[in-house]
């Protein structure tokens, strides 16, 4: 078959021989075994298929390509005179489009990069058969029904078999979706966060079956809101507010000590105990934390005045004897924004701005209305600085990403840069592999692959080091998608348990050159909200430094975050106060929840805290064991073997990630998400491979990027020794 040519078509039409020549070309193809058996060039088209019987099929017919396209120029005519019924076997093999047997079997795609152009110059009408076979999408001839017509299910609902074409656009025209600006406006004007409307998943079923919505809706097709952005955090246990509805714990009843006293006397320490993982593991944890959740905060300007406004502030009042902050009245802490309508006649609930899924929402954002702040066509927006590719930067020279916390620390900003480059690298590769794909298709396929990479690295490289020997017990192997599992982020996970990573922050981070030699570094506090370090030097020196710096065990917090963070604040106090703000039940409740030995008095703590001095200090600060804050008690536990955290944190973290995975219909291991060959490729990915792909210049890398190592030749490998993905697994066949 020929490819359409506008000039050829016009010339042939001008001399009146277009149809004759076109038929002649097709009959020449027939002579090679492609046409109806037993026909000659001058056979009447109506009789050609009709003369074919099952017995006369040639051996070539048995090897005919089974992809869904017509293989003869006269297929449409033969189908019009009933040959699909009277000569069914041959016609369905050679004329499947004309016989309408593709629906539910194949995907409707354009098979040439010029299909769109040819359609605009009316090739769909003047060269209909070739175009309908090879450019059905451009010719608007895809099998299946449009949204406006409805599907083939009861009441016009869509079914999976209706989705024989690939749609890359989620139609949100009939429902109001939220943007970050909507949330900010509601927060400023009404002191609460709005939730979004429940969508009709069936309207965009063909999109949802293949791609994630930006806001996470319709991941679960029966319960479309679970796990979605702009919804309330779920709870594992009922909250304990001082007034039963909304007042922070210990704000009226004074049942617990000052959060500052608990942080200063129990958590703050300059002593460091090293782990066999490295500081890049800590940074990955923060990256993932921002993928899963972002709690909206009320405006804190009023809190700076140290008012006792319980509605907006939960500031930590200070003692004059505090050695660091004694000159201040309080550490200002704004309350988390409540979901509109909660906290009056029901429990106050907090808001998650991000999707609960590991989907790269910190890269791409969590709103379809915000997506173009970060993307341009198939690619993420970039800025070239010092001949290096970065995200766009704001007026303060900080990188702009899908999550506005990207610049909290320069190490986190480095991972945002790394994955922006990785997305764009994948998009460019997919464009080369499938030049007929449009920009939307390339973007969504690239986003899908990046999300799968993050999932894979988190579950195979990150979590086993966090949970140690209890990883299999708490998370285990993937059992498949469970629509009855709620993947939503638990309030107790994001407000307490997963904040353990703050204890891994260190005082100083080195920079290393390509030979892993020290060339400087930065104190932690100097790396906060200052992307200029990587804009000037690139991300490689800092990432090499993170990989060679042993991870700090998280059971204590360095003075960099308890005495000097944010100028005059204490991250330990903020974490404790945040748990109280959210009404999180005390530590002893979570021991029981996790099926661990209960703690009824301070003596019972000896089974999980080996240091008697720590237990004695707990007794002095808290007076009663049932008053111990979840964050404090669980953080102070001795770590599980080979783990970073103790048994209570391992339980809560494992519980969350297990639900995150099992309740995600678009999890990379779900057999419907990637083809078998694509999944084989996804499973090759490692953090080391990503560094090779998207770093500025990593000629050598450690094979295990999250394990601490000495930079010797025996511990480093060349990038070409690290398995890479073969993107030909995503290649779609094109017409010849």
Predicted regions and their residues:
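Cleavable N-terminal signal peptides of Sec/SRP-targeted secreted and luminal proteins
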Residues: 4-23
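Compact disulfide-stabilized, cysteine-rich extracellular microdomains and processed peptide cores
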Residues: 24-25, 33, 53-54, 58-151
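Short N-terminal segments immediately surrounding and downstream of signal-peptide cleavage
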Residues: 26-41
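N-terminal accessory/cap region of cofactor-dependent oxidoreductases and related radical enzymes
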Residues: 33, 57-60, 109-110, 146-425, ...
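Intrinsically disordered, low-complexity proline-rich tandem-repeat tracts
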Residues: 37, 44-45, 49
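Mobile, glycine-rich extracellular loop/lid and propeptide segments
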Residues: 442
């Amino acid at each position: 078959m020929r490819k359409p040519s506008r000039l050829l078509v016009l010339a042939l039409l001008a001399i009146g021989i277009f149809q004759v020549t076109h038929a002649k070309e097709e009959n020449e193809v027939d002579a090679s075994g492609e046409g109806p058996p037993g026909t000659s060039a001058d056979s009447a088209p109506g009789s050609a298929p009709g003369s074919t019987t099952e017995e006369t099929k040639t051996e070539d017919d048995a090897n005919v390509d089974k992809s869904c396209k017509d293989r003869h120029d006269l297929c449409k005519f033969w189908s019009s005179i009933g040959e699909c019924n009277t000569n069914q076997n041959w016609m369905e093999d050679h004329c499947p489009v004309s016989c309408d047997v593709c629906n539910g079997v194949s995907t409707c795609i354009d098979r040439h990069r010029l299909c769109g152009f040819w359609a605009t110059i009316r090739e769909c009408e003047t060269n209909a058969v070739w175009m309908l076979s090879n450019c059905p999408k451009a010719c608007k001839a895809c099998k299946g029904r449009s949204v406006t017509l409805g599907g083939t299910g009861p009441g016009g609902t869509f079914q999976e078999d209706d989705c024989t074409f690939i749609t890359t656009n989620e139609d949100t025209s009939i429902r109001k979706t939220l943007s970050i600006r909507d949330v900010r406006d509601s927060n400023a004007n009404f002191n609460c966060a709005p939730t979004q409307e429940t969508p009709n998943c069936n309207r965009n079923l063909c999109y949802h079956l293949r791609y994630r919505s930006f806001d996470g809706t319709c991941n679960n097709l029966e319960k479309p809101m679970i796990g979605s952005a702009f919804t309330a955090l779920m709870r594992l246990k009922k909250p304990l507010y001082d007034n039963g509805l909304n007042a922070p714990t210990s704000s009226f009843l004074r049942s617990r000590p000052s959060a500052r006293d608990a942080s200063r006397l129990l958590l703050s320490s300059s002593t460091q105990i090293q782990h066999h993982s490295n500081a890049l593991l800590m940074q990955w944890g923060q990256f993932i934390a921002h993928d899963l959740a972002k709690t909206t905060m009320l405006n804190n300007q009023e809190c700076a005045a140290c008012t006792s406004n319980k509605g907006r502030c939960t500031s930590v009042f200070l003692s004059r004897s505090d050695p660091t902050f004694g000159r201040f009245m309080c550490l200002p802490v704004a309350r988390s924004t409540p979901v509109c309508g909660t906290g009056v006649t029901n429990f106050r609930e907090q808001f998650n701005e991000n999707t609960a899924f590991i989907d790269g929402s910190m890269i791409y954002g969590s709103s379809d209305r915000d997506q173009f702040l970060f993307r341009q066509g198939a690619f993420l927006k970039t800025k070239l600085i010092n001949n290096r590719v970065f995200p766009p930067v704001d007026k303060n020279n900080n990188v702009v990403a899908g999550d506005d916390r990207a610049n909290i620390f320069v190490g986190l900003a480095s991972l945002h840069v790394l994955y922006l480059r990785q997305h764009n690298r994948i998009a460019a590769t997919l464009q080369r592999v499938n030049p007929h794909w449009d920009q939307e298709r390339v973007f969504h396929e690239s986003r899908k692959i990046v999300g799968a990479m993050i999932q894979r690295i988190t579950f195979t490289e990150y979590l086993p080091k966090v949970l140690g020997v209890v990883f299999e017990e708490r998370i285990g192997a993937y059992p498949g998608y469970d629509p009855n599992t709620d993947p939503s982020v638990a309030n107790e996970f994001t407000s307490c348990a997963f904040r353990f990573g703050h204890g891994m922050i260190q005082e100083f981070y080195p920079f290393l050159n390509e030979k892993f030699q020290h060339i400087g570094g930065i104190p932690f506090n100097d790396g906060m909200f200052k992307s200029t370090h990587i804009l000037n030097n690139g991300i490689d020196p800092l990432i090499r430094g993170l990989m060679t710096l042993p991870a700090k065990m998280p059971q204590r917090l360095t003075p960099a975050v308890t005495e000097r963070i944010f100028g005059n604040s204490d991250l330990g106090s903020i974490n404790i106060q945040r748990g109280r703000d959210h009404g999180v039940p005390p530590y002893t409740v979570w021991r029981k929840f996790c099926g661990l030995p209960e703690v009824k008095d301070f003596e019972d703590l000896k089974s999980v805290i080996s240091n008697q001095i720590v237990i004695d200090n707990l007794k002095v600060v808290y007076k009663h064991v049932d008053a111990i804050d979840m964050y404090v008690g669980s953080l102070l536990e001795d770590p599980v073997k080979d783990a970073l955290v103790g048994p209570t944190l391992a339980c809560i973290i494992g519980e969350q990630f297990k639900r995150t995975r099992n309740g995600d219909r678009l999890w990379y291991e779900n057999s419907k998400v990637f083809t078998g060959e694509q999944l084989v490729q996804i499973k090759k990915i490692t953090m080391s491979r990503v560094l090779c792909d998207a770093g500025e210049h990593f000629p050598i890398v450690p094979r295990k990027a999250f394990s601490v190592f000495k930079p010797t030749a025996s511990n480093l490998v060349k990038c070409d020794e690290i398995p890479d993905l073969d993107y030909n697994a995503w290649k779609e066949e094109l017409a010849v």
